Amino acid sequence: MKRILLIALLCVLPLGGLLLSGCKSGHTPDIRVMSFNIRLSPQEDFDGDNCWNNRREAVIRMLESAKPDLLGIQEGYIVQVDYMDENLPEYGRYGVCRDDGLERGEANAIFWRKDRFEMKQCNTYWLSETPDTVSLGWDGACRRIVTWAQLSDKLTGKDVWYFNTHFDHVGKVAREEAGKLIIARIKEQVPEGDVVFLTGDFNANWDNPILDPIRAELAECRETALITDKEGINTYNAWGEKNAPLGADVIDHIFYRGVTAERYEVLNGDYGVPFISDHWPVMGTFRF
């Protein structure tokens, strides 16, 4: 039996450990935030040579190299999320699956460095007209969720609110309404001065008006970071089969408020396999 009860306990019990390094005297600390659609694995041979079992060690290598402080994944089946959890012992984890609120379907799990953050609360809601129950929203093809956590940063003493999502790939109305709902919830939940990160696969390119309700309240890392990729490395790589023009498939985003974006990068390096997913991870480095 998987660790549903343990996951629930992690949402209410503080995680131990004190970060003793990572911040130079006189400097505010950086925080690295990553969004990564890991590509679902409903069965072992799914995607053939690109199946999860052929990619999973490379995924861990990428994460060990990048060292994100906060990580939000999309499309994670429980076997994938459990594997990441087992191989990333320095991280805490929360995430339930969208089809039953437990272990059926995909999860937008979030991970945080236990030496950096202490969990205060976490939960999940559905992108629908009835967000607090398992439900399908508007014209969406699939149930879609937002997984969120309120974390206390041990270095700064500040609260950090982290929201992670995956918008529908079919329903235009579902994508439009999803952004409005998320912003309404953020306004309802988060005190004015607290730091917010919103990551995910939005199934909408960076310049799509569907993202306007989010842009009205939160900045977008790719557009505002001091060091960035404005040429538009595509975050959706389609296993190398699509060859879209630069900037045509930038659909994974990091939105934020309350910090300064220093760097945005698409992690499309060599991790020992041709592709670690059909999406590249994106990571933002921020300064308080």
Question: What are the functions of these language-model segments?
Answer:
Residues M1-P29:
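Bacterial Sec-dependent N-terminal signal peptides
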Residues L19-N87, D100-G105, K180, F288:
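N-terminal, active-site-proximal structural segment of metallo-dependent hydrolase catalytic domains
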Residues S35-E57, L127-A141, D168-G171, W239, ...:
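Acidic/histidine-rich helix-loop elements
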Residues L70, Q74-D159, F163, V266-L267:
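Structured beta-strand-rich core segments of catalytic domains in phosphoester-bond hydrolases
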Residues V173, E177, A184-V196, N203-F288:
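Metal-dependent phosphoester-hydrolase catalytic domains
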Residues I31, D69-L70, V160, V195-F197, ...:
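Short, Asp-centered acidic motifs that coordinate Mg2+ and/or phosphate
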Residues F36-I38, T165-F167, D201-F202, W280:
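Active-site metal-binding loops of divalent metal-dependent hydrolases
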